[in-house]
Amino acid sequence: MGYDVDIKRIGAMTLFDLKGTQKAILNWCGPHLPGFPDTPNTAATRDEAMFLHIGKDHWLLLADLSQEGALYAHLKPTEAPPDISVVCVSDTQCFFAITGADVDQILSIASPLDIHATIFPENGATYSEAFGLKALILRKPEGYWLAVEQSFGNMLEDYLSRATA
């Protein structure tokens, strides 16, 4: 049985890992963030940038690769105060977009994450696993994005291809 899905490997993305309290992050990064998500495991979006709350005092800033230089200049990772950590990790992740009518079925095959809208809302963003690999999973209006460590990109692409056959 085939599934009606499209799996696309997304090019590199700008990704910053931030650790610290919301107040400390706001004091340092302030206007350069899309805003803080309302609840853990969700994302706030503004101007194509996403700010993800993925754990206690743990955040990810995700944006188009063209924004990396400007964000680096604004966030100044090497000058961050000692109560926060700002690290550019853009080169560590491989992103995939999964879209189509059967996208929920494919994600259910790939991951144990409960994707019901009451549990994983439209702006859901969390770490879980995909085919046993640690994966960042984002709900998007058209489906999902999955990100795995760069070295596992080909493996995840193969697993997704096999799951949709």
Where are these regions (language model features)?
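Basic, glycine/lysine-rich polyanion-binding surfaces/domains
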Residues: 1-165
